[in-house]
């Protein structure tokens, strides 16, 4: 099917949601990515967390656009294992253009201006400074961005479509993996022998910044372990979307 270039201003609905064959090996993900890069070319960015879903998307993207632009929001609070994984990904996919996007404030400057442990006292403000504002800067020159959201991850993501109007960033958010289960993600990683964050083998289902990520021993929730001492469930990158 032929789909026009969808933008924030002309978005009406997801044209793929009832049309795309989701029974193929990638549950529609490959076709969505192929359409996205053909349509947006250099006007699309993959904001990559380097979690398990990221490994699937990176592998698929490399088959479509080997020199795709990938942005990692480097908060300066990530685990060393995450940085080690990025190095392994660079070795495996040398053509990918991986950009480490840092916040305007260093941790020291943030501590002086707000609080030395802002992630504890005001995690929403910390996420805004170190993740949301940097992504706003990245997307200021892009029409669309790619995310690894899956519907099964959490109730807040259950209505995610392939193509979404992103109200927070005033852009189009492309989510190729919405129909994938966690088991399918890991089967793909194992079958393709892809690199992944070693913390996943140490009971970390979801990996973010060190102060806000904990190992989990008694939950099947793929988002468990994030902000475990508060009611917070999202960093803020995905909370303003409309189904």
From Swiss-Prot:
- Which superkingdom does the taxonomy of this entry point to? Bacteria
What function is annotated for this protein? Catalyzes the formation of sulfite from adenosine 5'-phosphosulfate (APS) using thioredoxin as an electron donor.
Q: Any note on cofactor binding? A: Binds 1 [4Fe-4S] cluster per subunit.
Tell me the residue numbers annotated for binding [4Fe-4S] cluster. 126-127, 209, 212
The species this protein was found in? Staphylococcus epidermidis (strain ATCC 12228 / FDA PCI 1200)
**One cellular component term from this protein's GO annotations in UniProt:** cytoplasm
**BP-aspect Gene Ontology terms:** cysteine biosynthetic process; hydrogen sulfide biosynthetic process; sulfate assimilation, phosphoadenylyl sulfate reduction by phosphoadenylyl-sulfate reductase (thioredoxin)
List keywords of the entry alphabetically.
Answer: Cytoplasm, Iron, Iron-sulfur, Metal-binding, Oxidoreductase
What InterPro entries does the record tag this protein with? Answer: APS_reductase, PAPS/APS_Rdtase, PAPS_reduct_dom, Rossmann-like_a/b/a_fold
Q: Which family does it belong to?
A: Belongs to the PAPS reductase family. CysH subfamily.
Q: Do you know which Pfam families this protein is assigned to?
A: PAPS_reduct
Q: Which cofactor does it need?
A: [4Fe-4S] cluster
> Where found, per UniProt?
Cytoplasm
Q: In which pathway does it act?
A: Sulfur metabolism; hydrogen sulfide biosynthesis; sulfite from sulfate
Name the reaction it catalyses: [thioredoxin]-disulfide + sulfite + AMP + 2 H(+) = adenosine 5'-phosphosulfate + [thioredoxin]-dithiol
Q: Please classify the protein's predominant subcellular localization into one broad category.
A: cytoplasm
EC main class here is oxidoreductase
- Where is the catalytic site? 235
Which GO MF terms are attached to this record?
A: 4 iron, 4 sulfur cluster binding; adenylyl-sulfate reductase (thioredoxin) activity; metal ion binding; phosphoadenylyl-sulfate reductase (thioredoxin) activity
Q: What is this protein called?
A: Adenosine 5'-phosphosulfate reductase
Keyword check for Cytoplasm, yes or no.
yes
